[in-house]
């Protein structure tokens, strides 16, 4: 994929045809713009170089962790699931609910770990996101596709 490639993901056929290509691009360190159920987002795989490029692209002067898009709780071992978090996930996932859970293992990159060792996760129901997550087999980071202080994209 070139530096600026647009891949159609509107239909089920598009997603089936292109999800593996997007997953390879992410594994190779690429950044992607993607739809979610709320706004457009920017994301990457959990690797040092693309995470640093994503932070620069967002012009983040101070460390602010990126959230993780997941298919479900099974995608993120190493988080402390409280009873309340489990109830919320069962009730509202997939959907626009972000849970902030304490990391119990140090296997998360610093770019996704917040104050107190927490990680924000969301199970997006958007078919494009799900197709990529299924193909990639791991979470991706996500942040809104706008600069700080600007309206969401």
Residue ranges, per PLM feature:
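Active-site-adjacent structural elements in enzyme catalytic cores
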Residues: 1-153
């Amino acid at each position: 994929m070139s530096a600026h490639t647009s891949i159609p993901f509107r239909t089920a056929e598009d997603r089936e045809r292109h999800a593996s290509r997007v997953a390879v691009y992410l594994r190779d360190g690429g950044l992607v713009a993607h739809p979610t159920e709320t706004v457009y987002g920017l994301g990457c795989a959990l690797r040092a170089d693309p995470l640093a490029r994503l932070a620069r692209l967002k012009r983040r002067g101070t460390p602010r962790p990126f959230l993780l898009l997941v298919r479900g709780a099974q995608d993120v071992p190493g988080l402390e699931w409280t009873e309340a978090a489990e109830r919320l996930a069962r009730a509202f996932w997939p959907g626009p609910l972000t849970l902030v859970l304490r990391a119990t293992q140090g296997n998360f990159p610093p770019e996704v770990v917040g104050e107190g060792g927490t990680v924000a996760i969301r199970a997006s129901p958007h078919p494009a996101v799900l197709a990529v997550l299924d193909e990639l087999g791991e979470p991706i980071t996500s942040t809104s596709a706008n600069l700080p202080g600007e309206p969401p994209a």
